[in-house]
Amino acid sequence: MACARALNSQTDMTETEAREEICRVGRSLFERGYVHATAGNISVRLDDGFLITPTDACLGFLDPARLARLGTQGNQTGGDRASKTIALHTRIYAAARKFDAGTACVIHTHSTHCVALTLNAPGDELLPALTPYFVMKVGHVPLVPYHRPGAPEAAELVAQTIERHGAAGTPIRAVMLERLGPNVWHESPAAAMAVLEELEETAKLHLLTGPAKIEPLSNEQIDELRRTFGARW
């Protein structure tokens, strides 16, 4: 189901189609175990505002008509009460679009393996360059220190992190909130979901190796991925 549709730009969608796509992606993530209970949220940027999943909603059972609708300034204009993370989402859009103008979807989950890695003080980034597809499809995933869910300080740190990496010439598509979960973004819900899946599966792979020392890809191997596939690492 994850690859059932092409990863079309969100600008090709009407609001009705965007509502349906949020629900389709949420259901897919839930049914395949990438989200659980009422953890996680999905938003889409529209020309005149945003759609976001309601607070405490299960992503597997979303109703397109009940998604929260917000104006360009984040004021709610319709639907059920918006997720408390809307401020974080809007900061991500503002920062990420400086380097990826097509950014139109943000997904946040409490992905088990990603969160597990944050419990062992991994450093400034969640994962090293373990596999070629992690480098190509995800890229650097900076770790943001723990803040309570919805804390404005976390949103500020995330925005600063996105802008710092972008200014350095390595734009990112994901950050990891310590003990909470990843935020990923791309030009459509399907494309953002693909980033999330690759991130969580790489975290799982890392944990499966146990305490063994893992050698990441070499600088030469990463350079080859940059030259061949345009990897942003």
Regions found by a protein language model. Give the residues of each.
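Glycine-rich flexible loops
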Residues: T11-W233
